[in-house]
Amino acid sequence: MIEEEIQCPKGQEDTTMKLNTQYAVDQTMRLLSIDSPTGYTRNVTDELLSILREMGFSPVRTRKGAVACTLGGKGHPLALAAHVDTLGLMVRQIKANGRLAFTRLGGPSFNAVETENVTVITRDGKRYTGVVALRNASSHVNRELDSEKRDDSTLEVLLDEVVSSKEDVEKLGISVGDIICLDPRARVTPSGFIRSRFLDDKLSAGMLLALAKGVADGSVKPARKITIFFSVYEEVGHGASSGLPEDTEDLLVVDMGCVGDEITCTEQQVSICAKDSGGPYDYSMTSELIALAKEHAIDYAVDVYPAYGSDAATALRSGRDIRYALIGAGVYASHGYERSHVKGVENSLRLIEAYAEKE
C-alpha cells in the first residue's frame, strides 16, 4: 500500500538539471505500488515496458524476464542497470493450526519483517492479507517475548481469514510455493525523506526511467550508445548474468548507496562505491565518476561497502569483458524499512546525467 505521495519539497530541487527529480520520485512510487518479489516480477516488468513504449522506445523482455531498452547514441556502448525484483517471502508449509511457515526470497531481516502486513498471492491470482507474527506473540501471555530469537522457525504468517486447520487454508486455494508480498508502506515526507521497503532498488529504477524521459524529450544528449537494463533476480545473485547487450563496454550499476556506521554517505548524497564484498570496482571508471562529481559540484561520497554485492559482480562472473562501477542514492536501514531523501535522488541524477553526456 502506498500511504502518501506528495510533491518534492519546494526549494529542494535543482532547477538547472536536465533530468527531473520529481519524475524519478513519482516513478519510484509507481513501481513500489506493484508487488515484485524475486520470482514474481511479470507485473512490474509489464509496467516498465508500457512506460518506455509510451516514450517512443522499443524495450525488450528477455527470456529470463529482465527488461532492456536502448535509448540512443553511438559508439562505446554503456549499460546502466538497476533491479526491480525485491525481497519477499514464500509459503514453505501450511501448519496444522492454519498458520503459514515461510522461506525468505532474498535476505530480508527477520527482525524487520516481524509485525509487517503481507499479501499472499495464490497461483490462480487470489490475494489474501495477513501479518508476520512471532509464535505466541502476546506480551501478556509470553514472558520470553523480548528474548526469543526471530527466524523462520519462530515467525509465521497469520491470515486475515477464519482458519484453524491446514484444510481450511487449502480450501482458500493457498499452497506451498505461493508468493508472500511485504507491504512497502511507501511515503514521501514534507521534508523530503523517502521511506519505504524496497528502495533497494526501485529508487534506482525510477532514476533510470527519468534518464529515459530526458533522452526522449531531447533534454539529455547521449554521448555514446546507452542502454538501460532492469534485472529481476539481483536479490538472489544472478540478475545480470544474462541479458545485457553483447556490445556493452561499460556497466554502470545504479543501486542503493550504503548509509551506516563507518560509512561516509548520507541519504542526501550520491554514493560512489570503491569496493564491496566482491572486491574493488574498476579503478578508471570509478575515477571518472569521482572527477565528474567534483567538476559538477555534485554532493557525493566514496565508500567501501562491507556486506554488499551487485549486478556488476554477476555480469563479471558470467564472463563479460567490461568496465564496471556502482553508484546510488544513500539508503539507510537496507533490507528493512528503508529511508532515502530527494536530495540523494537529485545528486544521483546529476551524476547519471553527467556520465551519459560525457564525451
Where are the model-predicted features located?
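N-terminal hydrophobic/helix-forming segments and targeting peptides
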Residues: 1-359
